[in-house]
A protein has these predicted regions:
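A short, amphipathic beta-strand motif
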Residues: 35-43, 176-183
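C-terminal motif of bacterial Sec signal peptides marking the signal peptidase cleavage site
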Residues: 15-18
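Short structural boundary motif marking the start of a folded domain
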Residues: 31-37, 174, 274
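Extracellular beta-sheet/turn segments enriched in Thr/Pro/Gly and aliphatic residues
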Residues: 120-171, 307-375
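Tryptophan-paired
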Residues: 50-112, 175, 179, 183-329, ...
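Bacterial signal peptide processing site
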Residues: 20-23
Length: 375
């Protein structure tokens, strides 16, 4: 498993997004009384306590926007901190917007900011050259009232406090986490064995909105961890771009645990399921490699396809908004699998036999969805 995980998260579509390391300005002079605003955010996650949990709750960069109507009045960008202090503003009712890890730069119009989309870029959790870094997080626009003097948000109670609690950020993508996998071949397949070689995902959306009740874009592409021309099943979305970072080599299922899990990020997906696949080779009870359909391809590879958050026989869930086939922002889909039968030669055509796979999923905020599967 990779210690540093890449994931598909997107480039920003605005051409004017120059990013300076320190940006702080009164963009629109107003006639109201001069004031300052300091803000603290909370990007915490219940899952960050896990030993192998990725640093996808870290704030690499933080941008704070204050709008008077639709016009930008105050802006500040800070790095590697959850606090932005002494932003120059004026008194009155304002709209506060906070974005982490997106590096947007100054956006002079609130309407324009709310229409920004993320598109088509592979990004690292850790820095690499000029790549965008970290999971993008946002807070929907907040209406606040600025008073004369110092104003604070998230620094506790006291004079000038707009809110004592930090502003809550939510992650724009979802996370798909394989937290456990084992075999228990039974019936006619008792004594069979499975030797895993890799885990990958496909049908992963490559674009997303930043704001709004639904982040999915009508026009977007999809990514896959691998593809072979022989895969022709109904689950496959055409024209997917293969991204090696959506695949991990695995030689031992017991190495996958809740504290050492395999994970991928995906934007919101409505309608077409995102699929996680465990791929490897089957041997029968005499130790012979199984080749050929329906259980394996001509090279002896079988595939166990898991439709993330879908409703299927053998799938069990804990959490909210489960079994819909959709992926939602700021949600961790934690998948456990028990393999009981052979898989299929084509991962885009999952087996009809419900006894093939037991899947269990948990969903919480990060919302977590636990998905337990018997395959």
């Amino acid at each position: 498993m990779k210690a540093i995980k890449l994931f598909a998260i997107a480039a920003l579509t605005l051409g004017m997004m120059a990013c300076n390391k320190k940006e702080d300005s009164n963009v629109i002079p107003n006639e109201g009384t001069q004031a300052t605003l300091s803000i603290k955010v909370d990007a915490g996650s219940q899952l960050r306590a896990l030993g192998a949990s990725p640093a996808d709750g870290d704030v690499k960069s933080l941008e704070v926007y204050v709008y008077a109507g639709d016009l930008l009045e105050g802006y500040k960008k800070v790095e590697n901190t959850s606090e932005a202090v002494d932003i120059n503003v004026t008194t009155g009712e304002r709209k506060l917007v906070v974005v982490a890890n997106a590096n947007l730069g100054k956006i002079n119009s609130l309407t324009e900011l709310q229409e920004i989309a993320l598109r088509d870029k592979v990004v690292m959790v850790e820095p690499s050259g000029d790549d965008q870094v970290g999971v993008v997080m946002t807070a929907e626009p907040q209406t606040i009232t600025i008073k004369a003097g110092k104003n604070t948000y998230g620094f506790g109670a006291g004079e000038g406090s707009i809110s004592s609690a930090p502003l809550q950020l939510v992650k724009v993508p979802a996370r798909i986490s394989l937290v456990g996998a084992s075999t228990s071949f039974e019936g006619a397949f008792a004594g069979w064995t499975f030797e895993p070689s890799e885990v990958f995902v496909f049908n992963v959306p490559n674009s997303s909105r930043l704001f709004g009740p639904s982040l999915e874009l009508v026009e977007m592409g999809r990514y896959a961890g691998m593809k072979q021309d022989s895969w022709t099943g109904d689950l496959w979305v055409p024209s997917q771009v293969v991204k090696e970072v959506l695949r991990d080599e695995v030689s031992d299922l017991s190495s996958i645990t809740p504290n050492n899990f395999i994970y991928y990020h995906s934007f919101e997906s409505i309608g077409k399921p995102v699929v996680l696949v465990i791929r490897g080779k089957l041997k029968d009870d005499s130790g012979q490699l199984v080749k050929g359909a329906p259980f394996a391809d001509d090279n002896g590879y079988t595939h166990y396809s898991i439709l993330v958050n879908a409703e299927r026989s053998g799938y069990a869930y804990t959490g909210d908004d489960t079994g819909t086939g959709n992926l939602k922002r700021n949600t961790d889909y934690r998948i456990s699998v028990v393999i009981k039968r052979p898989g299929t030669s084509d991962p885009t055509t999952p087996p009809a036999d419900a006894a093939t796979l037991d899947v269990k999923v948990a969903v919480t905020p990060w919302l977590t969805v636990n998905q337990n599967i018997e395959y």
